């Protein structure tokens, strides 16, 4: 089968032929019909892969700590060899898709061969193996193309759950990419009043047309003033940050937009300084 992979060392993409995967007792084999490109996540993964070793270390201090621990227990030479081996590997891309079940592990219930499912954690491949708990049946009225958004949509929904908001709450969404647009729509569908902010005028227009009561191009103090007027001087009940930037501006701006004791949730990939 064909699968899209990326070099860990340099970020180069390749479409490769790989063996058909085998499933375990808790897994499901699915023939992919649609897979979703999560632009923010996949762009960040590719940017990290293309970075120098020093830049990789700064971006992933957790991995640096793993390397240090391994060097202490196994020695320097085995650690260097392990790091080089990891850098020479290729990793699959993608995590949100839909397709038709081909085979079901013996411990899986709720789906059977022939069912259409939305899947999470699967890459861009002709056939995918996913945990049975990450394969959700798709209603007949929902297309495969729409079902492929399920995992990304669940990320947006989880951000709103962490925000702990209800009908009538005022929610500001900072960053109107794919996850931000879904967050705004889900908040609106939950009965919230929604304001969206982004640096991209096109993204702001999309939100204004589909999901927000107020959509703003980020303009510093003017944006803060507009949010205060929209919230009648109170500030937002929750600020959900779905931006993708190395800058800490979104996290620094959020308190200016929020009321006293509001909730600020970071869903995106932003600086935290």
Question: Model-predicted segments: where are they?
Answer:
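Residue-level marker of beta-strand positions
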Residues: 34, 115-117, 127, 170, ...
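Short, well-ordered loop/turn sites that connect or cap secondary structure elements
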Residues: 111-112, 165, 258
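Short N-terminal strand-loop motif that marks the start
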Residues: 1-85, 89
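Mid-domain Rossmann-like dinucleotide-binding core that forms the NAD(H)/NADP(H) cofactor-binding site
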Residues: 116, 146-220
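Glycine-rich cofactor phosphate-binding loops and adjacent beta1-alpha1 units
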Residues: 205, 210-273
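A glycine-/small-residue-rich N-terminal strand-loop-strand element
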Residues: 78-87, 96-121
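A structural motif shared across PLP-dependent enzymes of the aminotransferase-like
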Residues: 92, 120-133
